[in-house]
A protein has these predicted regions:
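Metalloprotease/metallohydrolase-associated module, dominated by Zn2+-dependent proteases
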Residues: 2-21, 68-167
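Intrinsic disorder/low-complexity signature
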Residues: 10, 44-46, 53, 96
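Short pre-active-site segment immediately N-terminal to the catalytic Zn-binding motif
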Residues: 23-50
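Residue-identity detector for glycine
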Residues: 28, 60, 141-145
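Short, solvent-exposed loop/turn segments at secondary-structure junctions
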Residues: 31, 37, 55, 64-65, ...
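Catalytic Zn2+-binding segment of zinc metalloproteases
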Residues: 54-72
């Protein structure tokens, strides 16, 4: 099914998702290995996890309404971010343009009402050197972030990273 035909992402319980992942999104379905997570995910349309995963669906619409092109672009962006693992091993994933848009907007349920979400294209323009500075700021010290004041990753993106986006 084409991404444009999917209204909201749905969660599915499965055995194959590694325990280190909350969800793995494939073609509009968020796979997880926790039945309670599925229940919570599917309960309301405006919970942040569902909004986050639905943003990925809208991103696929923005890439010629193709899952294949979306996943190829996603893989390419992950590979491009590999230098970030010198700071923290999962930074290559967390600071990808698609993830930055999804984390930034996951608390705005109205964001998924758009036909497509393409702010990731602006995040993509941020140089790796600049992203690496933000990775260091986020993972400052030994912790897993946030670096100050119990800031969420969404708040961190809005406060620091979005200032590098074109007007």
């Amino acid at each position: 099914m084409r991404p444009s035909k999917i209204k909201l992402a749905t969660a599915v319980d499965t055995w194959w998702v590694p325990s280190s992942f909350v969800y793995i999104m494939l073609k509009g379905k968020a796979y997880t290995n926790n039945p309670k997570t599925v229940e919570r995910f599917n309960a309301t349309e405006d919970n942040k996890d569902r909004v986050h995963e639905t943003i990925h669906v809208r991103q696929a619409v923005s890439i010629k309404d193709s899952w294949l092109r979306f996943y190829l672009e996603y893989l390419w962006e992950w590979l491009r971010n590999l230098p970030l693992i010198t700071v923290k091993w999962h930074a290559a994933y967390k600071f990808m343009p698609m993830e930055l848009e999804a984390y930034c907007c996951q608390n705005q349920p109205e964001y998924i009402d758009r036909e497509m979400c393409d702010a990731w294209r602006d995040f993509k323009k941020i140089p790796i050197k600049t992203l690496k500075q933000y990775v260091k700021l986020w993972y400052k010290g030994d912790g897993d972030g946030p670096y100050i004041y119990k800031m969420t990753f969404s708040e961190f993106i809005k406060k620091y990273i979005t200032k590098h986006l074109p007007e």
